[in-house]
Amino acid sequence: MIQFVLAAPASGSGKTTLTCALLAALKKRGFGPCAFKSGPDYIDPMFHRSALRVDSHNLDLFFSAPDTVRALYAHYAAGHDAALCEGAMGFYDGLNCTTAASAWALADTLGLPVLLVVQPKGASVTLAAQINGLKNFRTPSHLAGLLLNDCSPRLHQLLAPLLERETGLPVLGYLPHLPDAVVESRHLGLKTAEEVSGLQEKIERLAEAVSATLDWERLLALTSLPAPVSPLPDFLTPASPTVRIAVAKDEAFCFTYAETLDALRAAGAELVFFSPLHDTALPEGIGGVYLPGGYPELHAKALRENEPLRCALCAAIQRGLPTVAECGGFLYLGQSLEDADGTAYPMAGVLPGQGFRVGKLVRFGYAALTPQADSMLFRRGEALPVHEFHHWDTTANGDAFTARKADGRSWPCGFANEHFYAGFPHLYWAGTSLPRRFVTAARSYLQKEPNP
């Protein structure tokens, strides 16, 4: 089975572009690849699934213990003959200026070779020195080969012998400069696949390029490993559905971890998707609703105009419908929300607070979320790893939890009670008690409210 981590010295080196190119090229060569993303980024896996029709999941050593990460990797790689893990940030960049939860830590946990993406513009021998620094910084480094990004054929011809001689690592090829294949991004990362003009043509262009410029024989030989084997964890063991849970899914609410949805199914949930933008009523017979993050700020006017759905949701929550709202879903439940132009629109009005644009990342990064009291999902004093990633804030963040970063900074946040959780932190449900608790609350609600 072909398996490797794609990493780089720093963000902006072209990992995501090369990931798309390699996945598409592997498909053209007859492989059935899957993809993984190191860290908490839900946007790239969503892009892999939508644009490339490739199964893609997150592997995060802050969210999950090493054994859980190995189990997730083995489970989601099963049935595929190639697995590509895209690293986040720089190769060794992890939690709080350590290597913890870094791309290197993931490669070390899974025992995978690493292909390093480097941009050679403006350097030659110095590039070899930088690569050797990465190669020797930790033992083992797992570095197995080099890929040159945004590189001309002539420069590749000059640099490849130098880099191989000075670093001992094979140069497996290059991706040329392709301005016509750029995938656009916005304030939280890549645009969704549906929004990128000419996306399939761009992906085809990338695949054709690396099909011609990579040494596939050497690449496949270096990355061919036995398929991973790990016992299927309980939190992914299939279960018969016992309750219907509605999950918001549309252009405004699209930031979900696929592993979270699978963990809910394994806990007994039948997931029913609906659109706060386009549907006028909640799905029938549900015992709970999950409002994930996304881009509600880009669709605030349309969300305001769908008053029937907003009213139905508000009434259901007031009746005690078990509800989880993360980040964008949390903003949707507030009193109002500004769009990108600063125009405020009424929202569901379940919670206090006006959502507003800040213009930069707010409280960005990992944190530990500790509840002040027992609630539907949480138990007092039970810390849970979370992640915040948003450019909008609200005038009422709540105080049911304390969020604390590794450097000691902390702040109050979130709303919670016996049937409710809402807040900016994104939760990673797989391997936790959250799915079982949510499903239990949903079943209990339906028993008390037979015709919700």
Could you say what each language-model-derived stretch is?
Residues 37-38, 171-179, 270-278:
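Beta-strand->loop->alpha-helix junctions that form or flank phosphate-binding loops
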